[in-house]
Amino acid sequence: MQLFQNLLVSTTRPWALVRGQNTARLLIVALDANHNVLVNEIENDIFRLIKQLAPGDDIENANVEVTHADVRYKQKKSLYKVTSTLTGPIAIEDVIYFNPPGGIPNTVDTSKDIIFRRIRFGRTEVFAQSEALLATQVQNKKVQAKKGKLRMVESQPSDSQEASSGDMKVDHRYVRSGLTNGMISGLLLFSIHSKRTTSAGRLVKTVIIGLGAGLLPMCMRNYIPTLKIEVVESDPVVLNVAKEYFSFEEADGLKVHITDAMKFVKERAEGNNSSKIDVLIIEVDSSDSSSGLICPEAEFVEEPFLLAAKDSLSDKGLLIVKFITCYPGVRAAVYSNFEKVFSNLFCLHADKGFNELIFALKKDSPFIGEEELAQACEALQRSLEHNSGDWVKQALVDSKKIKQLRKS
């Protein structure tokens, strides 16, 4: 119900939700918490009402979708709430779905209730959240990466018996977000295209702006051990939450900097070649809804930052930006900013909505067209032919969805 309260008191969020669902009209139905009406009866009433309100006579063939805000949860438990002076309200909760989402690792017993842990940021509660799978503790199986190859590994389950909820940890093998899958796919695809290889002592230097729950860097470390990951997070409260509730751990090859992201990127841009970044990922939510952006902060898609980001990249560097907006005008303006700085631009639409990833290569030439992308997809498939994990299949599917960025 809190979600509905936040939605209804806002002057912009309902319209943003309408645009985000790519629909012309939105009907919000708020039910008393003590109601005992069956879901199918509610839907029947909604359809009868829509028939009376809808324009035209072809309502039977209209595309009407009903989304339930709370009915999908069998159980929801609040674990922790904190208000940060930098980030605002942060809430952690465990949920059990009536119908769990797909992609659950086959080592998880799906005949029992599956618990998911979520982080919610108050400033973007309607739109954004990170969600992780809780499972018995798993151990990583270390595989030596061969010279010149991007070697992937998957963690294996431990031999421990069923654990209580207190013994459960976040399973970083599980990827719920289509955007996370897309980032991994794009990183692998353009690494293959640029013929970036790794050898002893040469890791792919990766910087992620924005920690959140820490799921992206932990997932990338598990699946792509050839990355040397640095995370830039401005809020120490967010780091503490990620460690305490989402099993985030710093280790060799994964370090967090509590500092200003703009300052960090500018210093890398002005530094020598040894400090340059191979892959720069921007994954931060907007704190100002009036900008028309849900992700990222407006300054991260403005020309001054994009110029600094380009200068911070190595010769074969790649910039990945998580980009979410409900407004076509804002999208066009952001595209225009990118086109002023980069020539090789690509995008991937994820999660069947207005979520998008923008990929920008530092090198302006040679120009990469659809034919070159198709060849890179084939090369990626060959490089992963000995990996049988579900995430590999998804990476290959997503890589084929990456297209040249166009305004129209």
Regions found by a protein language model. Name each.
Residues 10, 119, 358-360:
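Short beta-strand element of the conserved SAM-dependent methyltransferase core
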Residues 118-134:
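A short, structured beta-strand/loop element
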Residues 93, 120, 184:
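Residues in well-ordered beta-strands of folded domains
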Residues 100-102, 126-130, 368:
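Short, solvent-exposed loop/turn elements at domain surfaces
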Residues 94, 325-408:
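Class I S-adenosyl-L-methionine
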